[in-house]
Amino acid sequence: METPTYTSRMSKACVFCSIVSGAEPASIVVREDGLTAFLDARPVFKGHVLVVPDMHADDLAALPAAGIAPLFLLARRVAAAIEHGLAAQGAFVAVNNKISQSVPHLHVHVVPRTKGDGLRGFFWPRTKYGSDDERESYARRIADALAAG
């Protein structure tokens, strides 16, 4: 199993590290406490913001525990600012962890939403468990992995 990466240095190959350092241009909305939030270059909707830790973390597992609350507190503030500043009716807040993560630097998407905007909940089809036993088996396997640390 690959070990997640968290470094106190910025990665020269990482576009988000380049944005944080100022080497790559971006529309920054806020920089504070080791975090940077900027407009997504390929937004779902105009005003789509990415919130990133300044230090390189490949994914959520790589971010030290002390960094989790500040990251999501800023994402919450950005969501509120999007509602007030852009007259959005809400926000979609999400993290892709490895799969569908287009840039291997942890980032929280904060996407403005309005009723009837065409975005229909999640981007993937829903499924069902074949039985209560199968559902409980999944719950047990996850609980066991959590207990194992």
Describe these PLM feature segments.
Residues 1-149:
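HIT superfamily nucleotide-processing domains
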